[in-house]
């Protein structure tokens, strides 16, 4: 299959504007008709009586209500408040995150960035 239109040379621009009335639609298309086509149902879709009204429950549903009677109903039983659990005396207290010396993170980061820039400048 070729991507070029065989009716027009490559050096000439394609024709502009809408196609002429007699040339539209192209051959192979059915003649224009009203919408919707006659084989489709008209106003009143879906046809009256379709689907038929259901009587009671559809098939596959139990006749009794939900949930089935063998399950308990209502909230679970509530117990009196017992308070928090006792502390664990055998454990060590949590460690403080400031155990190591504060190293001045901002200044250390700036110095590292400056060293990297100097090293890259020297290499390139």
UniProtKB/Swiss-Prot annotation:
Location of the region described as Disordered in the Swiss-Prot/TrEMBL record: 1-103
Provide the alphabetized UniProt keywords: Cell membrane, Cytoplasm, Membrane, Transmembrane, Transmembrane helix
Which InterPro entries did the record assign? CYSTM_dom (IPR028144)
Output the Gene Ontology cellular-component terms: cytoplasm; nucleus; plasma membrane
Where does this protein reside within or beyond the cell? Cell membrane; Cytoplasm
| Main location group | membrane
Induction field: Induced by heat and oxidation stress in shoots. Induced in roots in response to cold and salt.
One Pfam family, please name it. CYSTM
Q: In which tissues is it expressed?
A: Mostly expressed in stems and,at low levels, in stems, roots, flowers, siliques and leaves.
**From start to end residue, where is composition biased (Pro residues)?**
27-40, 65-88
Its placement in the membrane is given as: Single-pass membrane protein
User: Which family is this protein grouped under?
Assistant: Belongs to the CYSTM1 family.
Subunit structure comment from the entry:
Heterodimers. Interacts with CYSTM7 and WIH1/CYSTM13.
Q: What does this protein do?
A: Involved in resistance to abiotic stress.
Name the UniProt record assigns to this protein: Protein CYSTEINE-RICH TRANSMEMBRANE MODULE 10
Organism, scientific name: Arabidopsis thaliana
